[in-house]
Amino acid sequence: MIELKEVLKEIVSPIVSQPEKVIIIEEASGRDVLLKLNVAPEDMGKVIGRHGKIAKAIRTVMKAAATAANLHVRVDILDYDELNETTPASDEE
């Protein structure tokens, strides 16, 4: 079975200058998969592209990969604040 999270990481990592800071959160419900992508702030423009063209291309490729696996996928590109809202807080103080 295709691991959509890994496919997205393989697409995004060569585009960004800090691939070690690529974070992908996967939420699946049946055949629906939501991938939340976060990159370093300085790489955000590289992932979105002029007029959103790179983001649209990434989503198109991911939809093709999902279709091959009989899944539906949505890719959300999060900024730092949105990532912190979706990530559970740790209990450390």
Predicted features along the sequence, with ranges:
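RNA-contacting regions in translation and RNA-metabolism proteins
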Residues: 1-44, 56-93
